[in-house]
Amino acid sequence: MNNPYLPLKAEILEVIQETTSELDIKTYKVKLLDGGSMDFMPGQFIELSIPGVGEAPFGFASSPLDREYIELSIKRVGLVTEALHSLKEGAGIWLRGPFGNTFPVKEMENNKILVIAGGLGLAPLRPLLLYMMDGRNRERYGEIQMLLAARSTGDFIYRREFDEWGRVEATSIVKTIDRPEEGWDGKVGFPHVLVGEMEIDVPNTYAVLCGPPIMIKFVSAKLVELGIPKEKILTTLEMRMTCGVGKCGKCNIGHQYVCIDGPVFNMAQLAEMPSEY
């Protein structure tokens, strides 16, 4: 197990521009140097630092079954991400982790899986999808349904992978954008409306959500209305974290620390948190 306070040196192997809109998101494929390794499971996160700039938490975006590299999908939005977006292949960064709890992949076995993601919210769910769709694990889970939403076609991340995902056995993808665009052949509308039109095996389904807070609020309410228990509706609160080890207090909600007790929570747990959340 890695020392949670000790950053490890890593090298950027590849930078992939994900979005073609003003929403600037890049995926970084990185490898730990000096024989370092980092075993993680879906839902966990990492702390990335750039000397002289700062440190910030990011959810893993790659399959936990790939040990050769780590992928992180990052939006340019602050000091650390601004500096990171200026780096090229071969540049060095520092990583420490992994931190946090995981999606309950064992409990989710023998259930159907409904994944609803908005924009960059697909990034922390990608490790879960890749884990479940992998041939070594696929038979453990039932049908996988995805509802992937973005404001515009240029805001989707991982579009190059959608066709491959759709070819996985018992897997389907519905894509939607907020407003009509020329040449778009997917859905137009908001996730909380479209999920009501989907055929969901309510008693045997786990729902996993990630996206803007307003999306999670309305989608989770719709899923509860449809009959999915709150205990089987999962999300991640990684945006609320800073230090990763429960020391800074920024992610404290009531008696819980998101970086330690989370970032993965079910809706029953969230319902017990203070109303200001």
List PLM regions with ranges.
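Ferredoxin-reductase
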Residues: 2-91, 150-152
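A generic structural signal for well-ordered coil/turn residues at beta-strand boundaries
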Residues: 8, 24-26, 42, 54, ...
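Short beta-strand element of the conserved SAM-dependent methyltransferase core
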Residues: 28-30, 95, 259
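FNR/FR-type flavoprotein reductase catalytic core
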Residues: 79-241
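Local cysteine-cluster metal-coordination motifs and their immediate loop/turn environment
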Residues: 214, 238-263
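Short Fe-S-cluster ligation motifs
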Residues: 249, 254, 265-277
